[in-house]
């Protein structure tokens, strides 16, 4: 059983996209430049996979983009120059984390605004319920209701 579990784990690791994404022929000889390339690749969206970075994607376009990033780094471009080049070529969508600019202001502010609005609506609803008396205790039972309840409870106790 342990061998089977170990084989399953090994197979799962080998089949994961992150293991196969960066091919050996893509790796740069300079470790510092390779680290920069990997960091930049994690910030860029695979245009085929949509919500996966090009560092994790096996798509042919992701491979081309990884190679392009490495070419730009080898040519001496800074990280911001590489990102600017790719944004100019593919648009802002290529960035997994869009920049905070006038065009993306709504994207950045919509989440906090919705969260604040939802919290305010919840607070108002709770406040309205407490004012309307919804939290008041129920009125006491009448003698007829108490007798009926006692009869139902004794029937329940007999049947169990």
UniProtKB/Swiss-Prot annotation:
Top-level division of the source organism's lineage: Bacteria
Entry membrane topology: Single-pass membrane protein
Residues involved in heme binding: 46, 49
Localization (cell): Membrane
Primary site of residence: membrane
One MF term in the entry's GO annotations: metal ion binding
Cellular component, GO annotation: membrane
Task performed by this protein: Required for the biogenesis of c-type cytochromes. Possible subunit of a heme lyase.
Sequence similarity: Belongs to the CcmH/CycL/Ccl2/NrfF family.
Protein name per its UniProtKB record: Cytochrome c-type biogenesis protein CcmH
Organism, as annotated: Bradyrhizobium diazoefficiens (strain JCM 10833 / BCRC 13528 / IAM 13628 / NBRC 14792 / USDA 110)
